[in-house]
Amino acid sequence: MTETLHLDTEIPRPRGDVWAAFADTRSRQQWSVPAGEALVYDNDDFRSGGSAEYRCGAPGQLQFSAIVTYVAVEEQSFAVQTETVWHGDDLLASGLISWFFDDVPAGTSVSIVDQVVSFVGQDMIEGSRNGHRIALEQLGTFLAGPGQISAGASDRDSRPS
């Protein structure tokens, strides 16, 4: 089962600030995980040709693991990566994920295109969609200053988000 997901948001901060929060592993561990879950990078070599490994899931269990290969990274512009996710020895999904960062009058537009293949059905694809939506919203919240409200993410595939 395959699908191409398109999600985006606008964040009222300069592109350099948004990119810094995206590129920094420690920051990414904070904003990219849904509330009530945990994510730990075992390694992250964020550069073209680099790779990363992380575990995520319920705190204390981290039952899912992923391997990432950074295909191409252009600072403050885009990152293209492959990502494969397992639960133990069970292969769940693999995808080609592209993040794009562009200047807009309100700050920075962040877009995600995820060409995902699920080996376990539609729920994994919906989980990817929901995970990206949450990550975009939380990236905006992470970067929002005191008293600021970040914008939500939109799903350009016209599905409820």
Where are these regions (language model features)?
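Hydrophobic/aromatic beta-strand elements that line small-molecule binding cavities or substrate pockets
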Residues: L7-T9, Y41-D42, A66-A72, G95-D103
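A conserved amphipathic terminal alpha-helix motif
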Residues: V116-S161
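Beta-strand/loop substructures that line and gate deep hydrophobic ligand-binding cavities in soluble
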Residues: V80-T82, W86-I134
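Hydrophobic pocket/interface hotspot
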Residues: V18-F22, R28, A52-Y54, Y70, ...
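A generic structural micro-feature
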Residues: M1, D44-F46, G60-F64, D89-A93, ...
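Glycine-rich portal/gate segments that line the openings of hydrophobic small-molecule binding cavities
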Residues: V40-V85
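Hydrophobic ligand-binding cavity/cleft-lining segments
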Residues: M1-A38
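A short, structured loop/turn motif at beta-sheet edges
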Residues: R15-G16, R47, V71-F78, F100-S109
